């Protein structure tokens, strides 16, 4: 299932811009049927995890898989039907393209400098110390780099935290004041 994989190799430079068109529906239906191992008409997180590759020959981060499923599962069925799967496919493909764009050395991993470039490209202005924190938090392999699946997870968490912060930053000055309970509510909403 090469369309799910990111395996760097010769000529694996930056991909097309995020937002590329979806492949043909019959192609996606064939992929959906192969991934739906139990033929339930719904792809579970386990089925999706087994179908995905992060390019490191390790299982795709289950937390990332559950996050993606929860974004697209409109009926709270702990999985995605075919219609929802087309959104999952596009979401993952768009992230692959972003990842390839910032994986400047085509290593299949994002190092600190590549992460800084990616997050800066997304509009974040963060300190070197914070980039170090992100690397430590999302580097499951302990190599000082982030794999594709963990890059997605890190970006999802950063976006959720940013959204929560913005709700409290009513004057948009980059500072908030919250009570301890508000802080706990913010943290528990993303855990």
From Swiss-Prot:
Describe the task this protein carries out.
Calcium sensor that plays a key role in processes such as endoplasmic reticulum (ER)-Golgi vesicular transport, endosomal biogenesis or membrane repair. Acts as an adapter that bridges unrelated proteins or stabilizes weak protein-protein complexes in response to calcium: calcium-binding triggers exposure of apolar surface, promoting interaction with different sets of proteins thanks to 3 different hydrophobic pockets, leading to translocation to membranes.
UniProt membrane topology term: Peripheral membrane protein
The protein's matches in SMART domains, at most eight in alphabetical order, are given as:
EFh (SM00054)
Describe what happens upon changing residue 47 to A. Loss of interaction with SEC31A and PLSCR3, and loss of localization to the endoplasmic reticulum
Entry protein name: Programmed cell death protein 6
Task: Please give the Gene3D superfamilies that the UniProt record associates with this protein.
Answer: EF-hand
Subcellular location(s) per record: Endoplasmic reticulum membrane; Cytoplasmic vesicle, COPII-coated vesicle membrane; Cytoplasm; Nucleus
For this entry, list what GO says about its biological process.
Answer: angiogenesis; apoptotic signaling pathway; cellular response to heat; COPII vesicle coating; endoplasmic reticulum to Golgi vesicle-mediated transport; intracellular protein transport; negative regulation of phosphatidylinositol 3-kinase/protein kinase B signal transduction; negative regulation of TOR signaling
Gene that encodes the chain = PDCD6
Q: Which domain of life is it from?
A: Eukaryota
Spell out the disulfide connections: none
Quaternary context: Homodimer and heterodimer; heterodimerizes (via the EF-hand 5) with PEF1. Isoform 1 and isoform 2 self-associate; probably forming homodimers. Interacts with CPNE4 (via VWFA domain). Interacts with PDCD6IP; the interaction is calcium-dependent. Interacts with RBM22. Interacts with PLSCR4. Interacts with ANXA7 and TSG101. Interacts with DAPK1. Interacts with SEC31A; the interaction is calcium-dependent and promotes monoubiquitination of SEC31A. Interacts with ANXA11 (via N-terminus); the interaction is calcium-dependent.
Sites bearing N-acetylalanine, chain numbering: 2
Q: Which residues form the EF-hand domain?
A: 23-58, 59-89, 90-125, 126-161, 162-191
GO MF terms held by the record: calcium ion binding; calcium-dependent protein binding; identical protein binding; magnesium ion binding; protein dimerization activity; protein heterodimerization activity; protein homodimerization activity; protein-macromolecule adaptor activity
Provide the alphabetized UniProt keywords. Acetylation, Angiogenesis, Apoptosis, Calcium, Cytoplasm, Cytoplasmic vesicle, Endoplasmic reticulum, Endosome, Magnesium, Membrane, Metal-binding, Nucleus, Repeat
Record: residues binding Ca(2+) 1: 36, 38, 40, 42, 47
Major location, coarse class?
endoplasmic reticulum
Q: What is known of its domains?
A: Interacts with different set of proteins thanks to 3 different hydrophobic pockets. Hydrophobic pockets 1 and 2, which mediate interaction with PDCD6IP, are largely formed by residues from EF-hand 3 (EF3) to 5 (EF5), as well as by Tyr-180 (EF5) of a dimerizing molecule (Pocket 1) and from EF-hand (EF2) to 4 (EF4) (Pocket 2). Hydrophobic pocket 3, which mediates interaction with SEC31A, is mainly formed by residues from EF-hand 1 (EF1) to 3 (EF3). EF-hand 1 (EF1) and 3 (EF3) are the high-affinity calcium-binding sites, while EF-hand 5 (EF5) binds calcium with low-affinity. A one-residue insertion in the EF5-binding loop prevents the glutamyl residue at the C-terminal end of the loop from serving as the canonical bidentate calcium ligand. EF5 acts as a high-affinity magnesium-binding domain instead. Magnesium, may affect dimerization. EF5 may bind either calcium or magnesium depending on the context.
Q: Which GO terms describe its cellular component?
A: COPII vesicle coat; Cul3-RING ubiquitin ligase complex; cytoplasm; cytoplasmic vesicle; cytosol; endoplasmic reticulum; endoplasmic reticulum exit site; endoplasmic reticulum membrane
Q: Which PANTHER family match?
A: PEFLIN (PTHR46212), PROGRAMMED CELL DEATH PROTEIN 6 (PTHR46212:SF9)
* Effect caused by changing residue 57 to A: Does not affect interaction with SEC31A. Reduces the interaction with HEBP2, PDCD6IP and ANXA7
Record keywords: Calcium included?
yes
Q: Which residues bind Mg(2+)?
A: 169, 171, 173, 175
- From which organism does this entry originate? Homo sapiens
């Amino acid at each position: 299932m090469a369309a799910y994989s990111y395996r760097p190799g010769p000529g694996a430079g930056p991909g097309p811009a995020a937002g590329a068109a979806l492949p043909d529906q019959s192609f996606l239906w064939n992929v959906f049927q192969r991934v739906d191992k139990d033929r339930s008409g719904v792809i579970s997180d386990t089925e999706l995890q087994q179908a995905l590759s992060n390019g490191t020959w390790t299982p795709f981060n289950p937390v990332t898989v559950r996050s993606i499923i929860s974004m697209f599962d409109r009926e709270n069925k702990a999985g995605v039907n075919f219609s929802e799967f087309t959104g999952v496919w596009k979401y993952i493909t768009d992230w692959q393209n972003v990842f390839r764009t910032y994986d400047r050395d085509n290593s299949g991993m994002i190092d600190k400098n590549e992460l800084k470039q990616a997050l800066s490209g997304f509009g974040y202005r963060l300190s070197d110390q914070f980039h170090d924190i992100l690397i430590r938090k999302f580097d499951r392999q302990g190599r000082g780099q982030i794999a594709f699946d963990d890059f997605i997870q890190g970006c999802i968490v950063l976006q959720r935290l940013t959204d929560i912060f913005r709700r409290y930053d009513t004057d948009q000055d980059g500072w908030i004041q919250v009570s301890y309970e508000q802080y706990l509510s913010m943290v528990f909403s993303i855990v």
